[in-house]
């Protein structure tokens, strides 16, 4: 790159952010975009480390220093081509990845100078290239005559479809929802990811040759057996939608909401999607408590304030430092008026026929658990009741295996996750192959609830396993 001391002379600059009082009026993305000049300047801050920790920390192992260099040289189409070699959804990951604990958190410049704005540049690459007419080059791809059914149009399914299509295998993607994306569309609010971004990705993939069959639920609208009969292989990428309960009294009271149905209902309302059985949950003028400290909890907090809730409180059982979600999202929630109660363990949702409050106990952090995080320990005599009209439970998600899995020898573990090893075993000859040799799986329904980018990675890896299975 041009100037060896660019990282000193040019400070880290993030895209402009809409002021809190303005962004609360809608569900639009809150971050702006780099113009060409600023993108080049920020990309040129990269040190091009010999051992790039950013690349290692990225779950898909993006060629980050290489495409930063291309952006700095204004070679945007080449940067787009390179970013798509490792990531099927770079414009989406650039928006929703927690870069502060992945690539940017591993940047050599993070301490003292400010990490390179990797996520914002990643978003800039695809947004700009698409706007200028760039599309993935499949001119040298030869059709193999093979076709694969993919169940689930979320990150894992899209990642799988991308790799298969680039290898000459016809990918047909089934999804029960009216639009692709899975939780990208229906779970992640528009202020983090505008739905037009996902809609554009659908157009790009359809131009590549991917076929989408939406509003189609396998096992209900189409029997799974027909997929086994008509396709050379099947990939399962249905994600995790079942919420994890807290196990305390009062969870069944009216006014207690699961995080995901709440977020989905809001997206359906904003986008005017008509989904059978869905009803809009409006928090206007209500006192809302959100339980949890991850990104989904922040999505619920920030959605409720946009619905004009009277007050939104986020209660978390550990301290702020131990919150599992993105620090950026916590900061955004605070700016938007969300109150935080740290070291509060919920023990009961109280009320007579409806939610009236949340009983919590203050905690202190004790010895580390098996994951190295210090356990919350209740402080004796510290119970209190926080008044509330609604409680949103955002403790995470787990897979809910389809009832027909056992009929087709698709094994799951004790947590309901499909058993599909990431490497060859005695029972699985190919990557991400299930106990049914013709069926592969990846993403959250294999690893449990995780990041968008890890689901993309596993979908892509599963596609490689399918290609080996098909001898393509």
Q: Where do the PLM segments sit?
A:
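Local cysteine-cluster metal-coordination motifs and their immediate loop/turn environment
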Residues: 44-63, 88-111
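Ferredoxin-type iron-sulfur electron-transfer modules in oxidoreductases and energy-metabolism complexes
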Residues: 23-41, 63-95, 112-141, 267-270
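A structured beta-alpha segment of the ubiquitous adenosine-cofactor-binding alpha/beta core
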Residues: 35, 207-228, 276-280, 343-389
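FAD-site-proximal beta/loop scaffold in flavoenzymes
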Residues: 252-285, 368-449
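Beta1-alpha1 glycine-rich phosphate/pyrophosphate-binding loop at the start
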Residues: 5-32, 61-73, 82-84, 111, ...
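A conserved FAD-binding loop/helix module that cradles the flavin
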Residues: 300, 445-471
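Short hydrophobic core segments
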Residues: 151, 231-239, 289-291, 389-396
């Amino acid at each position: 790159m041009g100037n060896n001391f660019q990282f000193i002379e040019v400070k880290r600059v993030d895209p402009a952010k809409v002021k809190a009082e303005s962004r609360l009026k809608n569900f639009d993305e809150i971050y702006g975009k780099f113009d060409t000049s600023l993108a080049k300047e920020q990309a040129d801050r990269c040190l091009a480390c010999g051992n790039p920790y950013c690349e290692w920390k990225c779950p898909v192992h993006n060629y980050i220093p290489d495409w930063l260099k291309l952006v700095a040289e204004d070679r945007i189409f080449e940067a787009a081509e390179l970013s798509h070699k490792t990531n099927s959804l770079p414009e989406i990951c650039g928006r929703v990845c927690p870069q502060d604990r992945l690539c940017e958190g591993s940047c050599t410049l993070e301490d003292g100078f400010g990490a390179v704005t990797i996520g914002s540049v990643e978003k800039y690459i695809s947004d700009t290239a698409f706007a200028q007419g760039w599309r993935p080059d499949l001119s040298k791809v030869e059709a193999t005559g093979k076709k694969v059914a993919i169940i689930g149009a979320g990150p894992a399914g899209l990642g799988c479809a991308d790799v298969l299509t680039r290898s000459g295998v016809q990918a047909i993607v089934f999804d029960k929802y009216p639009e692709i994306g899975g939780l990208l569309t229906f779970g992640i609010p528009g202020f983090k990811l505008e739905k037009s971004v996902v809609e554009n990705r659908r157009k790009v993939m359809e131009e590549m040759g991917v076929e989408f069959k939406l509003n189609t639920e396998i096992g209900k609208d189409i029997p799974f057996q027909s997929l086994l009969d008509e396709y050379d292989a099947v990939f399962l990428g249905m994600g995790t939608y079942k919420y994890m309960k807290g196990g305390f009294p009062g969870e069944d009271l009216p006014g207690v909401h699961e995080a995901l149905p709440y977020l989905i209902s809001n997206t359906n309302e904003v986008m005017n999607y008509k989904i059978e059985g869905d009803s809009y949950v409006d928090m206007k003028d209500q006192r809302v408590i959100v339980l949890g400290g991850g990104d989904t909890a922040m999505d619920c907090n920030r959605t409720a304030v946009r619905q004009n809730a009277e007050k939104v409180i986020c209660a978390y059982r550990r301290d702020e430092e131990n919150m599992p979600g993105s620090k950026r999202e916590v900061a955004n929630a605070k700016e938007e008026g969300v109150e935080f109660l740290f070291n509060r363990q919920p023990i009961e949702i109280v009320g007579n026929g409806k939610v009236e409050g949340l009983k919590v106990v203050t905690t202190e952090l004790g010895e580390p658990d098996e994951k190295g995080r210090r356990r919350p320990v209740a402080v004796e005599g510290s119970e209190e009741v926080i008044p509330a009209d609604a409680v949103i439970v955002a403790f995470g998600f787990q897979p809910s295996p389809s009832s027909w899995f056992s009929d087709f020898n698709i094994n799951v573990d004790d947590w309901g996750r499909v058993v599909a090893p990431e490497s060859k075993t005695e029972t699985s000859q190919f990557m991400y192959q299930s106990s049914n040799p013709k069926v592969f799986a990846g993403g959250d329904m294999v690893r449990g609830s995780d990041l968008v980018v890890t689901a993309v990675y596993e979908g892509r890896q599963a596609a490689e396993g399918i290609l080996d299975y098909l001898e393509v």
